[in-house]
Amino acid sequence: MDGMLRRRGGVIERLLHDGDAPVLVRVAQPEPRRVVFGARAVSREAAAYGIARMRFALGVDEDLSGFRRRFARDPLIGPSLRRRPWLRVARRPEPFEALAWAISEQLIEYERAAAIQRRVLAVLGRRWVGWDGAPDGLRDLPATSVLAGTEPALLESLDLAQGRALTLRRAAREVARGRVDLHGSDHEAGWRRLRAIPGIGSWTVEMLALRGQGRHDQLPAGDLGLLKLVGRLLSGGDPRALASESQVRAFFAPYGEWAGLAAAHMIEL
């Protein structure tokens, strides 16, 4: 709904960046067990980077056989797992994208957050310009250095709340200056530094981890959908019941390192 992904026929298109180099990635699935990736960029290195990030976003290289074997007969997620063994967590190609959009989605309904995201892309986003010099319409998130220098008042004019505008700029500054390495292997170190920023709590970091860093063990337990789901299940079906965050964590504890993926299967119950 943010407009960053475009579908033309059976092909999806996405604009990404390897540093400052734009990469247009196209993905198609001509057969059930075959996915084809292609990219246009100024260098082979940039094209390879864009393809790698889209492979991550779509989870095509993940081995979920252990998850399927372990939980195929689970009374809660087993039916979904048998019906949709291909289901993956909805990921973002870039971890900062997952972080930035999680900040924009805090405490508001998703439709409003998506509208804010579209405005950010329209005003600040990077555009794909075709080889003929004409704009193509695809946009990518602005560079972290751009967001780090954006006045909060401009972000507020796009309907981002004042506190979240400040949080987004501070997070972008930490990443742009290299103090937080979202692509690094030590995720926890980055999370600790991000948690020191006012406005970034457990839910935001867990959304980054799950959707931007591929951490299936991370569960955004404060998510309203999960609070409602677990509340309903624990109450015997009361649609108005809300669980606590600690109850959500306890509920998903049996799924261990797969808690985030288990939640993706369970959220539609």
Please provide the spans of the model-predicted regions.
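HhH-family (HhH-GPD) DNA N-glycosylase catalytic core used in base-excision repair
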Residues: 1-269
